[in-house]
């Protein structure tokens, strides 16, 4: 899969605009931390959604996901073989050993923060733990390419290279989910360009100082292929293998990549 934008550069934000984006991103970070702290077996994914929404609204922000293209909740809650876009539900009850991805967005003063992480309910199986640690590591390694002067697919390539290194580092075989990836972000959650999680380096628009991308590797213990369920949102692995999803909103600066969705 290739890059989808014909623009020669990725739009840049000013220093003040990046600060505004980080203010939104910090709210997202607090929401994610609150969800993880409260999550336990016997709770529903709807319960987790309510926790995140409360944190976002208490901070004076608005849940970006709620109502976005008709999405009915404030977070995406994706469990086990669900890769992304899981709809929180009172019927989805968490069990010990589940791997849960929470993807969350907040809009604050007109700017959007978008971030995700995956975590276990209780203790994870060794292979699943390896998958989750690997996906987090791939995110942190891949974002190192988010520097002025690089091109869009330099980030894609860095993510792919990190994924292959992670297989030996964490002792797991990993599938890179095809057809899903990161994106530009700012006043809107999804802006140009689309960011693939694999590919050749040196292509696509140039990253400028102040360019911002949501970088989000999605890895599985099996297939690269996925399917969308009848709800038109939930994306699952085609072979039932479990998936992990990690995401940060990241800006390119003179000092290197700047995470705009920190979790303090």
Locations of the language-model features?
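Active-site neighborhoods and metal-handling regions in enzymes and metal-associated proteins
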Residues: 1-264
């Amino acid at each position: 899969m290739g890059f989808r934008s014909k623009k020669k550069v990725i739009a840049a934000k000013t220093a003040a605009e990046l600060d505004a984006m980080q203010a939104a991103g910090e709210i997202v970070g607090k929401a994610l931390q609150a969800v993880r702290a409260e999550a336990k077996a016997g709770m529903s994914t709807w319960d987790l959604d309510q926790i995140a929404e409360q944190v976002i609204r208490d901070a004076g922000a608005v849940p970006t996901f709620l109502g976005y293209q008709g999405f009915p909740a404030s977070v995406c809650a994706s469990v086990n073989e669900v890769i992304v876009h899981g709809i929180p539900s009172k019927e989805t009850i968490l069990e010990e050993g589940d791997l849960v991805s929470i993807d969350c967005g907040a809009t604050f003063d007109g700017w959007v923060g978008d971030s995700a992480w995956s975590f276990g309910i209780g203790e994870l199986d060794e292979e699943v733990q390896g998958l989750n640690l690997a996906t987090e590591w791939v995110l942190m390694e891949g974002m190192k390419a988010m520097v002025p002067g690089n091109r869009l697919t330099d980030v894609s390539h860095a993510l792919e290279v990190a994924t292959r290194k992670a297989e030996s580092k964490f002792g797991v075989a990993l599938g890179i989910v095809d057809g899903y990836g990161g994106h530009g972000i700012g006043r809107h959650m999804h802006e140009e360009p689309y960011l693939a999680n694999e590919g050749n380096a040196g292509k696509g628009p140039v990253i400028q100082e102040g360019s911002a991308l949501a970088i989000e590797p999605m890895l599985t213990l099996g297939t690269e292929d996925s399917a969308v369920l009848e709800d038109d949102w939930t994306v699952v692995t085609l072979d039932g293998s479990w998936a992990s999803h990690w995401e940060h909103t990241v800006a390119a600066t003179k000092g290197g990549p700047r995470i705009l969705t920190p979790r303090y």
